């Protein structure tokens, strides 16, 4: 590589945020350098070998709609696929894939190495070069200075990382990898608001020492789902089952009797852990009335004997881990191949970021992933694609972009972070979105792919496939709205109809009946409806069956759009707004919301405060 090369964008970190950031920047045509401490670990799944789940699967679909890497890699590495909440409404259905770690890394690396405008270099970063309030490059561990017009930091749990097993602790970014101590210090010297968070991982078990006969088998779905809109089931490797087991009262007794050896309960760990992925110690303390907890026994891959016991994350001493693991059903003779541990790391208050994930202090420095206080591969990847894209757009002198809350779960994620901050690792759920009927997994491409194409993120293959799908949906919907189902068709549908038709109706109206699907309409030769793939007929059915609810949410969004379009100047000093409480003034001055709607989402900012802001804007003749 040319050390004198001026890169447009340097991405630091090769995890899920970093790989999406680097690919996004390169797709936009700017010269991009991805720096990682180990090229062999690009796209490494540091904890659970799985992609997707409730809320998370929605993010993966949105990343895919923007031509990101995660869904394609999950399809190529997924060894079990399931649709969660399949019996519930379409808003909360979510895809989840158990993944082979090795195949996932391979899939990500293949995408990185085949991407134009992208160079990969193995070096840890120790420092940033700052001149005139802008970042001008990075300094690596071996003293190389690499110049850049923008930098994206995606450093995961490596900043000041400290690993805990019982009362023993040592520096580490994850087991077997060194932390970024020098970079952590450099960032702290920039006076950015910093905190500490904690996460953990369970011990790994040798599959050959497990008695699966005591467990419940959990096979994947048939037909096997896919993650990517461009994917097919033929992309998947061999499919395998997971299993379910449970802790016992003996497990709980051992853990209770050893809580004094837990670094969390002994006060050794300062960082706050993830609320929705608690350690087994936390579960037993917080849910003391429960006599057992469920454990998902998940394979780590097709070429390894290691098993991931999802549900027993722990930082207890290794000898205690051995004791309690062997009280779990089917684990009586278990051999632990790797101990569980907790890891503490630095994160920076995301309220110091704009919605484009650039730091307010240094506008060409972008943060994505766990550095912003999130947890999870999917949350990291979603931030990565936005940060990398915006770094490239900034270089090109184009308007930066982030989806709104009503456009994508990515928008919900980023708005939550920059508006409310987080005191604990942030995880996405469907319940965080106000408009989740609009933000479904099945329509992520309809929501985002056209915008991705306009921005330069979406390539020709995806655009051609999407355009054909959208045309098929629109033309078929037009047919349904202009075709009639007659009363005499009652006989044709007598096996399906809960109540016979009393009058003729349009086919689109007939499809709203819960017992009727698109296949029923194909029975009517005079409609001349086309045979369509399942993903298209599903979209048509949802759009018709939920039309009233969807219209209602659209109306709510239009009402709120006025506040979204009421911009608040960055230079506005909220001390000048008459009538605001000191708490509201303090929060508004710190966060500097960009719109009246964002101000309203800040904790403690009341409707009365928003009215005062509107009055102030009008009095000051500021644009409203």
UniProtKB/Swiss-Prot annotation:
**What are the entry keywords?**
Cytoplasm, FAD, Flavoprotein, NAD, tRNA processing
Which residues are FAD-binding?
13-18, 125, 180, 370
Q: Which SUPFAM superfamilies match?
A: FAD/NAD(P)-binding domain (SSF51905)
GO molecular function of the protein, one example? Answer: flavin adenine dinucleotide binding
Q: Where in the cell is it found?
A: Cytoplasm
Task: Enumerate the Pfam families for this protein.
Answer: GIDA, GIDA_C_1st, SAM_GIDA_C
Provide a GO CC annotation, any one.
cytosol
Q: Which residues bind NAD(+) per the record?
A: 273-287
Q: Which cofactor does it need?
A: FAD
Predominant location category: cytoplasm
Question: What protein name does the entry list?
Answer: tRNA uridine 5-carboxymethylaminomethyl modification enzyme MnmG
Organism lineage reads as:
Bacteria, Pseudomonadati, Pseudomonadota, Gammaproteobacteria, Legionellales
